[in-house]
Regions:
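Short, mixed-charge, low-aromatic patches
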Residues: 1-6, 18-21
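Long, charge-patterned amphipathic interaction tracts in eukaryotic proteins
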Residues: 3, 35-36, 88-91
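Intrinsically disordered, low-complexity, mixed-charge
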Residues: 7-8, 71
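Compositionally biased, low-complexity repeat tracts
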Residues: 9, 27, 31-32, 88, ...
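Amphipathic alpha-helical interaction modules
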Residues: 14-61
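Amphipathic alpha-helical binding modules
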Residues: 60-113
């Protein structure tokens, strides 16, 4: 449901590992714990993120940073407290995000008919 295609990055051969994409999608859509590396990036704890990242993620850490800063919902990032609130769907923040994505996907499908 999340479009990971970023033309300028893919043209340079830079793309997030599928496992990382999956972890972020599961976190954003279902509230699942994203794991040490992704959670650290979302919390803006970059020292921990570098320590937790495997070799593939170290090569593309700036790709994830860029996606988070440009595309991730503001309420799902910035601190470990924000991550907990997102996972707990406090105030329906995650539910609202998912509904918005679903509506956008439906409108895109309808506009191509």
């Amino acid at each position: 449901m999340i479009d990971w295609r970023t033309k300028d990055l893919r043209n340079m051969g830079m793309e997030l590992a599928l496992e990382t994409q999956e972890a972020i999608e599961n976190y954003l859509l279902r509230g699942w714990a994203p794991g040490g590396y992704v959670e650290s990036m979302l919390a803006h704890d970059y020292a921990r993120a570098f320590a937790c990242a495997d070799t593939a993620n170290r090569l593309t850490i700036w790709v994830l940073w860029r996606w988070i800063t440009e595309s991730a919902p503001p309420l799902c990032q910035g601190s470990y407290k924000a991550i907990k609130m997102w996972r707990d769907d406090l105030g329906g923040c995650r539910t609202d995000y998912v509904k918005g994505l679903e509506q956008k996907a439906i409108w895109q499908k309808l506009s191509t008919v």
